[in-house]
């Protein structure tokens, strides 16, 4: 087993059985998480406890004892799981995080090849603002005395759409609205009214202290302090972005653009995207902005993991949880693939709901509520990812960092390989690639069914064929000479993401089977199994960096109340949970 040690005197680099070929320099940069202590905010400093991956049977300082009972065990170290774990650790809870892989972060992790540092998933980072209450990444890092340097992105995304519709979503809100109005002058009023509705929701959220919506004392407190804001959110909770947009906008092409905006948020069109989810993203990109962490997105998880250890909790790598242990109907621990068992007062699953209730629990232990969830939501498709190192000459001057490409047909938006999302983080942080080179992160929708039943040879050939088609499209649309500029290429399929991210079918997350009633059907953090909680994109409010961080904050608050680290009102708790359960049944 590999674990994070509190031994700050370790001098030898960890021996990691990586599937990526990390350089020694790369491993050392991972060990020294780029964390700035609050007392030394003017410069980079070494963290108080070095993140060292050591044998579980080795250093006593980092040894994880099976007989030891924790306040909480967290399955998985995605952003949602790490935020929940660190928030609990700060409150005084003893937390054990169990991670299947050898580095933290999940979809927000990283890997290195030949001098290139790649983000595993999205490079579009929200939550780093220094203002408001939705700067959840900043808050999570500050809670464990960490701060990351970031680089502001002047353009959230550059859309390249059918009929030569080319729209930049500028960081400055008025610039974005002006550009959109220039394309659709006849919809000027409708554009402003739709986005004003988004701001109404965002400003309400941003004014509230964000904690668990399953904790009645918090809810009552917020309602009495901010009744208008709370009622605003309650009003929009069952509504979808597409319905709101159609109240103000009639132009079919502009409505298709709103669909593309929402597709980036939720992998579905606006009519299926909850208005609250859409508003968080469509407004925070202008309020707090997109800010890229220096050194890559993986720095977020590294800093949170280091902060967790510094607060006295533990993180165990290569810890593949295969079973949640129940006693008298209560979650009391977990079992690993090697037979080791760990016990805690509560268990928090950062796995998807399909993994949690389809693999980690026996069929007879699955509550009816979770069976109902699967009737409302299905697994969104996975994606094909292409990580490339390219020569710098291929980028035109003033190329934006993020691009969304849908060349010729709006009807292809949701189809496999129909649209392409491209990030070039070296536009912001050149240190991620060798001099004279850039990084391309390319993502497009793909389903695991299209990759099953192939021989190894057929699988590899299909990867190359599909990747070549995607690269050809980018070359034709944006980057002439792209193919000749490629010096490194790694292609990931839904099977890759299922294996390394431990996500059932490699899914991006849940999506509604039919037009949803906003977020009413989305479960929160508690489950029908006593002592078991869920966190991440299978919980309210859904997918995205802000959303899963919000989920982590909410989960930590609810668990802390149940453990006695926060005030609670048992009678009100029971009534509220029954009400929330009933609301999900009418979704």
UniProtKB/Swiss-Prot annotation:
UniProt xrefs under InterPro entries: Amino_oxidase, CrtISO, CrtISO-like, FAD/NAD-bd_sf
Entry keywords, A to Z: Carotenoid biosynthesis, Chloroplast, FAD, Flavoprotein, Isomerase, Membrane, NAD, NADP, Plastid, Transit peptide
Main subcellular location of this protein, as a coarse class: plastid
Enzyme class: isomerase
The UniProt record lists the keyword Ion transport: no
Cofactor(s) needed by this chain: NAD(+); NADP(+); FAD
Reactions this protein catalyses: 7,7',9,9'-tetra-cis-lycopene = all-trans-lycopene
GO biological process entries: carotenoid biosynthetic process
EC number: 5.2.1.13
Annotated organelle transit peptide span: 1-50
Cell compartment(s), UniProt: Plastid, Chloroplast membrane
Membrane protein topology class: Peripheral membrane protein
Tissue: Up-regulated in the flower buds and flower lip tissue, while it is weakly expressed in leaves.
Single annotated GO MF: carotenoid isomerase activity
Metabolic or biological pathway: Carotenoid biosynthesis; lycopene biosynthesis
GO CC term, one of those recorded: chloroplast membrane
Plastid among keywords: yes
Family: Belongs to the carotenoid/retinoid oxidoreductase family. CrtISO subfamily.
Protein task: Carotene cis-trans-isomerase that converts 7,9,9'-tri-cis-neurosporene to 9'-cis-neurosporene and 7,9,9',7'-tetra-cis-lycopene (also known as prolycopene) into all-trans-lycopene. Isomerization requires redox-active components, suggesting that isomerization is achieved by a reversible redox reaction acting at specific double bonds. Isomerizes adjacent cis-double bonds at C7 and C9 pairwise into the trans-configuration, but is incapable of isomerizing single cis-double bonds at C9 and C9'.
UniProt protein name: Prolycopene isomerase 2, chloroplastic
Organism annotation: Oncidium hybrid cultivar
